[in-house]
């Protein structure tokens, strides 16, 4: 059997089948995404612009490793980064543990590959974990959980692990109190960890929940003083913010992203990045490492 080709030549059926198989194989190979521009984002911090500058040596190296331009998606909230990744506006970035779990539940294409191994810094212990802490202003009458009944509590963001999930789901059970909105007179969202701490320092809130490493960043930035606060409660260890990518990217791009972060400690510029983010290295992580967050959601 034969058929007429566009070039005007006859081809055998076998030749035609071989060509069709080649087309199918090529289509399969192209089913992954290979964007000319890679977009990076991260959940908002006390100073997202400054924190982005910390990532510059890493992103510069990634440009060399991929041959692609990299753009930054400026976040407005935790949820905005999640939605940007789900909508393919962002290809890789840094989420919070809770926002990662939310993103993963909406799409299996969101894949965690690493996190920070933090250096010891004040109340932040060394390792790839942190704790949620409940803070009040030292010298105030709020020196126990019982004394906070009927007061104003500041959280960070509904999609923040330490500023939303743990206070709402974990803390009431651990402290044996009613839900937050029943125990406190008012629950407010500060929008960022530093703003939650500052709201307590400036008497705009009576207490706040904040991540231990974010609290120390606020202290180190000179915005508040560690000695000005009581720590009334702290959670068990929770894994640090996950580095994620969309696994629909082509393998060479995914490998370049992962390798760039995992070898960041091998260069002088990378060492400066680690110093800025108060970390000793970047360590691999997997989805199951965040099951503790999923379990908290069930409470």
Regions found by a protein language model. Give the residues of each.
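A ligand-binding cleft/hinge motif common to bilobed small-molecule-binding domains
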Residues: 94-108, 167-173, 199-202, 206-226
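Hydrophobic residues within well-ordered alpha-helices
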Residues: 85-86, 148, 200-201, 243
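Bilobed "Venus flytrap"/periplasmic-binding protein-like clamshell domains
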Residues: 35, 39-65, 75, 98, ...
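Acidic, polar ligand-binding/catalytic clefts
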Residues: 83-147
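Boundary at the C-terminal end of the N-terminal hydrophobic targeting segment
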Residues: 25-31
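An extracytoplasmic/periplasmic, membrane-proximal ligand-sensing/linker region
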Residues: 32-40, 46-57, 63, 238, ...
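Bacterial N-terminal signal peptides that target proteins for export
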Residues: 2-15
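Short beta-strand->loop
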Residues: 110-127, 185, 219-237
């Amino acid at each position: 059997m034969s058929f007429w080709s566009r070039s005007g030549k006859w081809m055998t059926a076998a030749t035609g089948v071989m060509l069709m198989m080649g087309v199918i194989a090529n289509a399969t190979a192209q089913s992954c995404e290979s964007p000319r521009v890679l977009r990076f984002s991260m959940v908002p911090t006390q100073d997202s612009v400054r924190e982005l500058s910390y990532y510059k040596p890493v992103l510069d190296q990634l440009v060399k490793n991929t041959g692609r331009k990299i753009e930054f998606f400026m976040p407005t909230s935790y949820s905005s980064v999640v939605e940007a990744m789900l909508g393919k506006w962002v290809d890789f970035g840094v989420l919070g543990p809770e926002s990662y779990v939310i993103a993963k539940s909406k799409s299996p294409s969101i894949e965690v590959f690493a996190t920070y191994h933090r250096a010891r810094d004040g109340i932040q212990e060394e390792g790839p974990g942190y704790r949620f802490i409940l803070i009040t202003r030292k010298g105030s009458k709020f020196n126990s959980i019982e004394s906070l009944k009927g007061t104003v509590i500041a959280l960070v963001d509904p999609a923040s692990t330490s500023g939303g999930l743990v206070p709402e789901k974990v803390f009431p059970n651990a402290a044996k109190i009613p839900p937050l909105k029943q125990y406190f007179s008012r629950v407010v969202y500060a929008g960022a960890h530093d703003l939650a701490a500052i709201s307590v320092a400036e008497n705009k809130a009576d207490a706040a929940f904040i991540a231990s490493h974010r609290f120390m960043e606020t202290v180190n930035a000179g915005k508040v003083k560690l000695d000005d606060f009581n720590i009334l409660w702290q959670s068990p260890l929770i894994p640090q913010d996950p580095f994620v990518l969309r696994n629909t990217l082509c393998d060479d791009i995914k490998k370049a992203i992962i390798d760039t972060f995992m070898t960041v400690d091998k260069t002088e510029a990378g060492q400066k990045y680690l110093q800025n983010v108060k970390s000793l290295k970047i360590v691999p992580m997997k989805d199951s490492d965040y099951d503790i967050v999923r379990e908290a959601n069930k409470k």
